[in-house]
Amino acid sequence: MTPGRTGLVAVALLGLWFAPAHAETIYVTIENLVFTPTEVTAKVGDTIVWDNKDFVTHTATATNNDWNVVISPKQASKLELRKAGTFDYFCRFHPNMKARLVVTQ
């Protein structure tokens, strides 16, 4: 292999080594006034999709007010995770609906 090609192969392999991980989409179902699953672990950059199967509007609202997602009846809403931490959340309209989102780097 010539020196030019060796360098090109090394750069290509280095790019594969440092390529960012593929972001995941994680689904949470809302049905009968319950978030399922009640605890989700995800990574920064992942997307959470709340799929509301109920006939009423819900929210997914972080208890620390970092985010608030409104989910219309029979619709889905999403949130891209931008910050690591443990986030307890609830529905503003139905405060007994509670869940936890653990976001890692």
Language-model segments: which ranges?
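Extracytoplasmic copper-binding redox domains, predominantly the cupredoxin/blue-copper superfamily
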Residues: T2-G4, L13, F18-Q105
